Amino acid sequence: MSSKSKNTLKILFVSAEIAPFSSVGGLSQVAYFLPRALLKMGVDIRLFTPKYGTIEEKKFPLKKIIDELKVPTDKPNESSQPQELICNVKVIKNPKKTEPVVYFLENMEYFEKRSNVYGYSDDHIRFGLLSRGALEFIQKKLFVPDLIHCNDWHTGYLLNYLRQNYKDNPLLKKISTLFSIHNLYQGNFDFTHATELDFDDGKSQLSSFFSERFFKQNSLKRGIMYADVVNTVSENYAREILTEEYGAGLHNLFKELRGKLYGILNGLDYTDFNPQTDKIIKKNYSSINLHDRAENKIDLQKQFNLEIRPEVPLLAVSGRLDEQKGLDLIIETIDFLLSELDIQFVVLGGGQPKYIGFFEELEKRYHGKVGTHLMPNFVLPRKIFAGADIILLPSRYEPGGVVALEALRYGCIPIVRATGGLADSVVDFDPEKGIGTGFTFKKFTRENFIVAITRALETFKNKSVWIKIIRQAMQQDFSWNKVAEKYLDLYKRASEFRKESLLPNPPMALRQIVT
């Protein structure tokens, strides 16, 4: 059991990826920064994640704390498959007191032998093992949490197991739960085109790990159903997923359970992302001494082989080049803008070949006006945020939108489609009031996008107004400390929900799905 005070809130944060041990997408960054912010606030938060074969044990030496943890697979007696999968649990040797404890679930077949975090045909088994392994770990009583914080479809199984298979377990049944949805990906099976025979209503018992039925049971859906509280990574996205357009086939379920659905915008590490101290950029600056920012623009122009023209508006795209990010809209627009206006344009990121080919040709046609780096890079984004005037983010949908937060921090003004987290993080500039941190548009059309860009470029001509927008952008507070406070509120709501649901006659609102 924890050595901390009995009154200390104890959280087990379960995630398929956690930076710096395993990092594929934004989830790993949330799993890194949010627990650290909560730890500073006095929460006893610990993490539970697979021990993948890619984790460098020289860099992160581990010690075993549980040997041969038996995780049930629920396989039928007549099956030749194992009834249990044997795992170990490890922790980092000599961890820093400023960092949360991380428990690594070790299994040779499903984690250790795999070179990637995702992308396997048996991912449903792998994350079923993670989910049930976490519950078996808790029963060893090395750490018994008050709440389990689950993330994305990989851990939806855990919430289902907890409320069905372990519903009468005296140690587990009182534990409250929060399910954070970072995106609506639902695993390898295509649930949106499932036949009537394959439809999963979410109420049946989870099948054996090795059965075809388990593959077709929707972990994300079940996590939503069985969690005490559900949140997405922005308030606006929480509203959007109630609609057919954004709900990925789950909009009716979200509407049914909207009473327990919340949105919290992700944060940004203001110590790491700090233009005053950032060693990556050419010249440090702040919202007060913005004149130093100009050196970064010249540096960016040199880096991308552009003409050195500090007075020309420099527009940028940074991130994954795919349809979700609105690349089709950029392609429909950018050629016209470059031919008609005196602007420069840089593109950074890897992605779909059709987009890469387009930007390669664009750079050839507009030599000196267009620069590209068409592969992922972890250094250049900072240089773009510090040197570009405008970042283009015309996403089709965007649950969180961390690129906008990074750009705002460095005074690179976003032009965004007002969707998901982008609508929550960027304030459309109002010229009459002089208030705003960027430029927004709603309809996903070329015309609306061009209007937003035109508004920004016209405003750019008025240097005093543009500097005011930059200052307002840089002074926004999206720190993880603020985010952590909001998660604490959700933890309290989840705890209240669990206590009420355990009453002999729970309120009708709590009898939603689980009976």
Where are the model-predicted features located?
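Catalytic cores of nucleotide-sugar-dependent glycosyltransferases that transfer UDP/GDP/TDP-activated
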Residues: 1-515
